[in-house]
Amino acid sequence: MKKNGILNKELNTLLASLGHTDTIVIADCGLPIPNEEARIDLALVKGFPPFLSVLDAVINELVVEEIVLAEEIKTQNPDVYESIKARMSDVPIQFVRHEEFKEMTKQAKAVIRTGEATPYANIILRSGVNFS
């Protein structure tokens, strides 16, 4: 058994497979997922696991060079938006309209579905490299 970090086999496999510029999505429970094969469904019940807990676990193990958020998160879910900014203050943010965000998810290697049930609690993470 792993000593610490992410225990989910599919999520570990995904993170280990990412190369530079690959993208993944962490999504609330309502975001449409375009490709069933690329879904890692962690949702257990409404609200669990929360988006921010999953984000924390992933960014603890992944080099992120850029994030993409829906523009609407700023006004429709300011608490989650501020929490993302606080956690990832050194990572550039690209903002797009929600419809464009949904189109961008089609290019992601996978969508990680959480139980989050607040609006626009979705993020695209672009993988960086761990070179010094």
From Swiss-Prot:
Coiled-coil segments: none
Catalytic activity: beta-D-ribopyranose = beta-D-ribofuranose
Keyword Cytoplasm assigned: yes
Source organism superkingdom: Bacteria
Pathway: Carbohydrate metabolism; D-ribose degradation; D-ribose 5-phosphate from beta-D-ribopyranose: step 1/2
Any GO molecular function: D-ribose pyranase activity
Chief location: cytoplasm
Keywords from the named record: Carbohydrate metabolism, Cytoplasm, Isomerase
Residues annotated as catalytic: 20
Subcellular location: Cytoplasm
Its EC number(s): 5.4.99.62
Purpose: Catalyzes the interconversion of beta-pyran and beta-furan forms of D-ribose.
Xref: NCBIfam families: PRK11797.1
PANTHER family: D-RIBOSE PYRANASE
Family named by the database record: Belongs to the RbsD / FucU family. RbsD subfamily.
Protein name in UniProt: D-ribose pyranase
Native source organism of the sequence: Geobacillus thermodenitrificans (strain NG80-2)
